[in-house]
Design a protein with these regions (language model features):
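Bacterial N-terminal signal peptides
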Residues: 9-18
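Boundary at the C-terminal end of the N-terminal hydrophobic targeting segment
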Residues: 20-24
Length: 337
């Protein structure tokens, strides 16, 4: 055995290890309030390394690059200074990749931008919602759910104005989108936005966006599916508020519940019966809670029994109850047109 060569190898390993120990990882930096020039240089180095891996388009490289760049944002306490600095560098490097002809690259790049959760990274996601490719639009919508989840779990690096811009973009997205799965993801993003800066009315805006979608002529999306999802979310918002939801939220919940009843009535003989029964129950429960919140009519006393009407395939009975509900929604305290 060549002991000289072995000794040299050991020394080399020790030197490499000592360098690595002296060099902070991105995850180590994530909790720092003050970033040094060396920290910024290391961020640059790792951003360049992993974005280059993603750019190759090789599935394994894309996965490894994405995981390396999102891992720092999984820390319990990601500071705003780190998020802003890492975000600044990442957005610059990621921007050309978000429009890559390789959908795998574009989607994973948007996912990273969502975890970064800054003003600049949000702009990439809003642009992604307009991409002509459905998988990329889905990636952008999902990344917005991650962005708002990040804003909830640590000090947010987005403003109320940023949230407003995202909500407007999601409303536009819902109005134009034909795929119910993508709309469902947009609903998730808008619900999560409620806890972001300036996002308190996000669920209301989501509900009204779905109502407008359902009322639209020639809407290709599955109206029953998306309206049912919106009603469940608004029901949960009302329940979570313990009777103290803002009046606007209660009205929006009632409006989308009324729209769901219209959808159920129109699809009574064509849609899956179990799905209709579940939707009818959600609509009636949501109306009841909304009216109670607004000190409105006693919905329970109306004995709507919507689910029973659906179960019995009672078209006439369901139509009559739907008319009663719509009449209530047009009067005080709802005043829905």
């Amino acid at each position: 055995m060549n002991w000289s060569r072995l000794a040299s190898a050991v020394v080399g390993l020790l030197i490499s290890a000592s360098c690595a120990l002296g060099q902070a990882s991105l995850s180590d930096m994530a909790s720092r309030i003050d970033l040094s020039d060396a920290d910024r240089a290391e961020i640059t180095k790792q951003v360049d390394r992993y974005t280059a891996m993603i750019a190759t388009g090789t599935p394994a490289n894309v996965r490894d690059g994405r995981e390396a760049l999102t891992k720092p944002f999984e820390a319990d306490k990601v500071t705003v200074p780190f998020r802003v600095e890492a975000g600044r560098q990442l957005v610059e490097a990621l921007k050309p990749l978000t429009t890559s002809s390789n959908e795998l690259v574009a989607v994973n790049t948007l996912r990273i931008a969502g975890e970064v959760a800054t003003t600049n990274s949000m702009a990439l996601l809003i642009d992604g919602l307009k991409d002509p490719r459905p998988p990329v639009r889905m990636g952008a919508a999902y990344a917005l759910t991650r962005l708002f989840a990040q804003a909830r779990r640590s000090a947010p690096a987005i403003s109320a104005g940023d949230t407003a811009s995202a909500l407007k973009a999601l409303e536009t997205f819902i109005a134009a989108e034909r795929d119910a799965r993508l709309i469902d993801t947009a609903i998730s993003a808008m619900v999560l936005a409620a806890k972001a800066p300036g996002g308190i009315a996000a669920p209301d805006r989501m509900a009204r966006a779905i109502v407008e979608k359902a009322r639209g002529k020639g809407a290709e999306a599955d109206t029953l599916t998306i309206t049912s999802r919106a009603v469940r979310e608004m029901r949960d918002v009302l329940i979570g508020s313990d009777g103290k939801a803002p009046p606007g939220t209660a009205r929006a919940a009632a409006e989308v519940a009324g729209q769901l009843i219209v959808a159920i009535k129109s699809q009574l003989t064509t849609a899956d019966k179990e799905a209709l029964i579940t939707a009818a129950g959600s609509a009636e429960t949501t109306l009841t809670i909304a009216s109670t919140t607004l000190a409105g009519p006693d919905i329970a006393a109306m004995k709507l029994a919507l689910a029973d009407k659906v179960r019995a395939a009672d078209q006439d009975g369901l139509s009559k109850q739907a008319e009663r509900v719509l009449a209530v929604l047009k009067s005080e305290p709802f005043n829905i047109k």
